[in-house]
Amino acid sequence: KLISRLYDADSGTVQIGGTDIREIHTDSLFKYVSIVFQEVILFNTSIMENIRLGRLDASDEEVIRAAKLAGCNEFVSRLPDTYQTIIGENGAKLSGGERQRLSIARAILKDAPIIILDEIAASLDVETEVQIQTGLNHLIQGKTVIVISHRLKSIENADKIVVMKAGTVEACGKHAHLLKQSPTYRKMIEKSN
């Protein structure tokens, strides 16, 4: 929420490329960041238009390409009006995994250099999580990715893991380092196994 400036820091700074984000106009900052939330925000319009929110000037072909990369095409092709199907308020006519894949497609279409994945697998079953992983792999390629997760499997291969405890940073490092240095991280791993 700090990176996307939903809130400003009470103290200290949040920087992108060495620039305090408070010095970056909100519209410009929005272009640099894509957020995929656990609770996907969808509108009572077509699948095509829900994905196009990632980049309003995208052609239909670009929207469909992003949808295919996110793994949407399989379920969309079974819908009565495919990409023109109206999905209901907040995607009520879709499963959680389908809604999540639309959100990933939207982020792929936006093609922002910074991706925030906020607990996106928390409410998904293991099979659905595996299905969306392919879309995520397309989304994060060559990007700066910030993953907020309690599912530790999803962060084990990260370049840098930040362990938070009671609102403060307890430790930073790679998985193997944190197993040795962070009691909190070690306990979380033990509980997840």
Residue ranges with predicted function:
Residues 52-60, 74:
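ABC-type ATPase nucleotide-binding domains, specifically the catalytic core motifs of the NBD
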Residues 180-193:
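C-terminal boundary and immediately downstream tail of ABC-type ATPase nucleotide-binding domains
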